[in-house]
Amino acid sequence: MAAATSSIAPSLSCPSPSSSSKTLWSSKARTLALPNIGFLSSSSKSLRSLTATVAGNGATGSSLAARMVSSSAVKAPVSLDFETSVFKKEKVSLAGYEEYIVRGGRDLFKHLPDAFKGIKQIGVIGWGSQGPAQAQNLRDSLVEAKSDIVVKIGLRKGSRSFEEARAAGFTEESGTLGDIWETIAGSDLVLLLISDAAQADNYEKIFSHMKPNSILGLSHGFLLGHLQSSGLDFPKNISVVAVCPKGMGPSVRRLYVQGKEINGAGINASFAVHQDVDGRAADVALGWSVALGSPFTFATTLEQEYRSDIFGERGILLGAVHGIVESLFRRYTENGMSEDLAYKNTVECITGTISRTISTQGMLAVYNSLSEEGKKDFETAYSASFYPCMEILYECYEDVQSGSEIRSVVLAGRRFYEKEGLPAFPMGNIDQTRMWKVGERVRKSRPAGDLGPLYPFTAGVYVALMMAQIEILRKKGHSYSEIINESVIESVDSLNPFMHARGVSFMVDNCSTTARLGSRKWAPRFDYILTQQALVAVDSGAAINRDLISNFFSDPVHGAIEVCAQLRPTVDISVPADADFVRPELRQSSN
C-alpha cells in the first residue's frame, strides 16, 4: 500500500471506520465559520456593553488597537479528526470549535498490546531530556500491561549516557541497551529522541537503517521542517508519527511516577500522523501517548507542531519569561526595592502564585484576586507590554515558519565543536548574574510550600505576554488545544515549577538542546523591548489602552482554558531542589 501523507486541512466530520483499514487519518476539508475571537470586533451585546463601560473612564485605545479589533484571523484553527479501533475518541468544544481527544489513564494500559500490534521492539534513540523519561514510562507501562514488547535504548558507542541508561535498568545483557544503528535496524517502532541538530545531520543514515514498513516516532516536528527547507521528505516505505509531550522530559517522568497510585498522571501530549503505510499509525501513536501517561492527547499535524513548539519555547515557555523577570528585577531594584523583595515580586510571583492560579482557575482569576489599586497597576502593565511582546513574538513565529530559526539551531549545534580553525562554543551559563545569586538566598529562607506574593505589575506584564502569544498562534491558524497547551498549560504546570525550585537554568537546561538554544537567543530580545518600550511608556504616563483591557476580559480563550483545566494532570508536579529525575549535570542538593 502506498504511503498516505496527512493533510493540514481542517475536519470536523467523523467518517465511519473503513472495513479495509482499522485506522484512518481523516483530512476532509470543511469550511469553518469564524466566530468573533480574541481581539476581533463582536456583535455580542454583552461585549459591547463591557467595552463601553470600561472605555468610559477617559483613556483611549491606539490606532494599532483599532486595526487589531477590526481585523480577522488569517485562517481558521486547524481541527483534525482521526479514527482509532483501540481507544475511545471524545469530542470537546473549545471556544466554539470542535476538537477530538483521547483521555489517558493507567486503566487503559491493558489496551497497549492491541495498539502496538505487530511491534516486537521499540527502539528509543537518545538519552537527553525526553529519552530517559519516555523509555522508562514505556517500559513500566508495558510491564503493567503484561506485554513482551522490548523497549531498547540505542546510543552512540562510547557515549557517557550508557552508564545513565544502565542505572535506569537498561542493560546489554538483557537486550535493552545497545548501539544506535543496531537498535534502529532491529526495531519496529523507532523513537528518535536525539537532539534536533543531530537529527538534521544524521537523518539519511537513520532512514537507511530502518526496516521497510517500520514506524518512525518523533517527539518534535523539527526534522520535517529541516527536510522541507531542503525540498525533501521522509522515505515512502515507513510510517511517520509524532507524540509530543507538552513539557520537558523530567516532568514527563516525574508526573508519571507521582500518579502511579491514582490512575495515572503525566503531561498532556499532541499526536500527529504524517505518513501511514499500513493503517496502524494512529493507534500506535495513541498507544505511545497513553503509555507515557498523558492525561489527554489531542491531534495536530507535524508542521503545526514544530511551528508552535519551537515558537512557544522561545516565547512564554522559556525565553520570554526569562526576559521578563530580568527586565522587571532590574526596574524594581533601580526604583529602590530590596533585591530579595524584587526577586520575590518577579520570579517567585510568576512561578508560584500566578502559575498556580492560572493552572487551576485561569488568567481572569489573577486579575480578579487583586485589589482595586492592584487592578489599575495590572492594567497599566498589561496595556504597555502587550504590543511590544507581540512584536517580538510575531518576528519569532515567522522566523520559525520560514525555516530561519531551524537553520539557526542546526548551525549552532555545529559550533559546539571545533571547526574551520575556530574554537568550540558550547552553551554558557545563564544563572550566574547578581539576580540569580539573590534567588539562591531567597530560596534558602523560603518556607516550605510558599508560593510567593502576587505583585500586580508583574502579573500584568506576564499575562499580556501570554495573551499576545495566544493571539499570534490563533492568527496563524493553530487549534485551541495546541494554543492553550503551548501558551498556558506547559508553562504553568510543567516548566515554571522548575524555575520556582532552583532558578532559570534549572528550568531551561532540563529541556531539549533546541529549547535551550532558543531561550538564550530570544530572552534578551524580550528584556530589551520591555525595557526600551513598555517600561518607558509606563514612566511617561501613556494612557491605558482600553480596547486591550476590554478584549482581555471577554476573550473566548478563557472558556477554552476552563475546559482544558478539567483535563489537567491529577496531581501537581513536585520538584524538590535535590531532584534526582533531572539531567545528571543539574543534580545537586543546594540552591
UniProtKB/Swiss-Prot annotation:
GO MF annotations, alphabetized: copper ion binding; ketol-acid reductoisomerase activity
Boundaries of the annotated transit peptide in chain numbering: 1-52
Reactions performed catalytically: (2R)-2,3-dihydroxy-3-methylbutanoate + NADP(+) = (2S)-2-acetolactate + NADPH + H(+); (2R,3R)-2,3-dihydroxy-3-methylpentanoate + NADP(+) = (S)-2-ethyl-2-hydroxy-3-oxobutanoate + NADPH + H(+)
Domain KARI C-terminal knotted residues, every copy: 301-449, 450-586
Domain of life of the native organism: Eukaryota
Chain positions recorded as substrate binding sites: 512
Alphabetized Pfam families for the sequence: KARI_C (PF01450), KARI_N (PF07991)
Main location class: plastid
Stretches the record annotates as Disordered: 1-20
Enzymatic class: oxidoreductase
Textual note on the cofactor: Binds 2 magnesium ions per subunit.
EC number: 1.1.1.86
KARI N-terminal Rossmann domain segment(s): 102-300
Active-site feature positions: 220
Keyword entries, A-Z: Acetylation, Amino-acid biosynthesis, Branched-chain amino acid biosynthesis, Chloroplast, Magnesium, Metal-binding, NADP, Oxidoreductase, Plastid, Transit peptide
Binding residues for NADP(+): 123-130, 156-161, 195-199
Any GO CC annotation of this UniProt entry: chloroplast
Compartments, as annotated in UniProt: Plastid, Chloroplast
Modified residues (N-acetylthreonine): 53
Pathway field: Amino-acid biosynthesis; L-isoleucine biosynthesis; L-isoleucine from 2-oxobutanoate: step 2/4; Amino-acid biosynthesis; L-valine biosynthesis; L-valine from pyruvate: step 2/4
GO BP annotations listed: isoleucine biosynthetic process; L-valine biosynthetic process
Subunit annotation: Homodimer.
Family: Belongs to the ketol-acid reductoisomerase family.
Protein name: Ketol-acid reductoisomerase, chloroplastic
Source species of the chain: Arabidopsis thaliana (Mouse-ear cress)
